Design a protein with these regions (language model features):
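Generic detector of low-complexity/intrinsically disordered segments
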Residues: 25-26, 58, 77, 81
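Generic cytosolic/nucleocytoplasmic N-terminal low-complexity/intrinsically disordered segments
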Residues: 32, 44, 83-85
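C-terminal edge-of-domain segments
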Residues: 64-87
Length: 87
């Protein structure tokens, strides 16, 4: 995702989700959308939200997990958005 696309995506989801707006205002950075445990399609190897959170915490980040949205702003119930911030 190019930087301007990422900025547009973050503006879109922040406009509709107050929790995401609050995280951005607090200096959190969007990392990725990740599958919730058990939600990855069969046969697909993908890191779950728990694996992302664990790795980021081990790297010293404060981590938050929110609802995930696609590029059109539609809720993705099988995904979670991962956010990080250095304490």
């Amino acid at each position: 995702m190019a930087e301007t696309e990422k900025e547009a995506y973050l503006a879109l989801i922040a406009a509709q989700d107050p929790q995401i707006r609050a995280l951005l205002d607090q200096g959190f950075e969007f990392v990725t959308n990740a599958f919730k445990p058990g939600a990855a399609p069969s046969g697909m190897k993908a890191r779950t939200e728990r694996e992302h959170v664990r790795r980021l915490q081990q790297e010293g980040y404060q981590v938050e997990v929110t609802a995930a949205y696609d590029e059109q702003g539609q809720l993705r119930p099988t995904l979670s958005a991962i956010w990080r911030k250095k304490p």
